[in-house]
A protein has these predicted regions:
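Conserved sequence signature across two-component system core domains
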Residues: 7-8, 34, 52
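Conserved Asp/Asn-Gly motif in the active-site loop of CheY-like receiver
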Residues: 31-38
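Conserved acidic segment of CheY-like receiver
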Residues: 2-13, 17-18
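Alpha-helical interaction/dimerization surfaces of two-component signaling modules
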Residues: 16-24, 43
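CheY-like receiver
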Residues: 38-130
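A generic structural motif
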Residues: 25-30
Length: 131
């Protein structure tokens, strides 16, 4: 089972992703949900996850900085950005982080399905190559 965290400062987004999306279909366990990047990184400093689903603009630490720090600690972590911002500086930041996807709010679950399927494929491929 893959382990994932969700990080978004909007309670409705956190609730929607946790309660209404079918993570179990992809054998993904959401182990924690956070409202800001700094608190999420405190968790990541001690706990490995396979997938980071994060907003970009948040208090205390933005999603790009969170992703950079997470990638420094776990180079194989997969990242999906979810944001209401269409500014190219955020898109470039996501590209630099080699994110699996950048999904605009409000989240279309078909788009999220495609991104999550890519994550599962990438992790399975990595695990097969290690064997």
């Amino acid at each position: 089972m893959l382990r994932a965290i969700i990080v978004d400062d909007e309670q409705m987004v956190r609730h929607g992703l946790l309660s209404y999306y079918h993570w179990d279909k992809y054998n993904i366990e959401i182990v924690r949900v956070f409202a800001d990047g700094a608190t999420a990184f405190e968790y990541l400093a001690q706990n490995h996850v396979d997938l980071l689903v994060t907003d970009i603009v948040m208090p205390r630490m933005n999603g790009i900085e969170l992703a950079q720090k997470a990638r420094e600690k776990y180079e194989d972590i997969k990242i999906i950005f979810i944001s209401g911002y269409t500014d190219t500086k955020y898109l470039w930041g996501a590209l630099k982080m080699n994110a699996v996807d950048y999904i605009f709010k409000s989240v279309d679950f078909d788009e999220l399905d495609a991104a999550v399927e890519r994550v599962v494929y990438m992790v399975e491929k990595r695990n097969t190559e290690r064997e």
